[in-house]
Amino acid sequence: MNRKGFTLIELLAVIVLITVITLVAVPSIRYASKKIQEKNYDAKLKMIKASAEDYGNDYKEIIQYNSSTTYTDPNDHQTYPSVEVHVSDLLANGYLVKDADIDRDDILDPRDDSSLKNKSITIYIKNNNAYAVLNFN
């Protein structure tokens, strides 16, 4: 009697092996995914900051001479003329492009898919250059 099959012990051993591999791999995959999301978020923040500084440089005379608000630079403790804008302002004026994978005009946080559209940015003029401070929590 020559049977060509697996014994119950062999099947259980394979199931246990697959379970162990899964238990080891899933947390590693989640960790890697979270790290990728954090890197994407950091890249998106850099893009938003650069766009805000471009906006500020284009409108620096208006900010410098017509602004009623100021920003105190924590490095030199000096106050500079400033304006607060939102990500939606940068989108509306063409300084940012909406995320390609959504239908609405928005930029999403890659960590949780929440909107960044209403987040504020302080733009201040120092030494005839615009600097942006992201007011994201």
Q: In which residue ranges do the predicted regions lie?
A:
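Aliphatic-rich helix starts adjacent to a transmembrane/signal segment
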Residues: S28-K49
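N-terminal single-pass transmembrane signal-anchor helix
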Residues: N2-I29
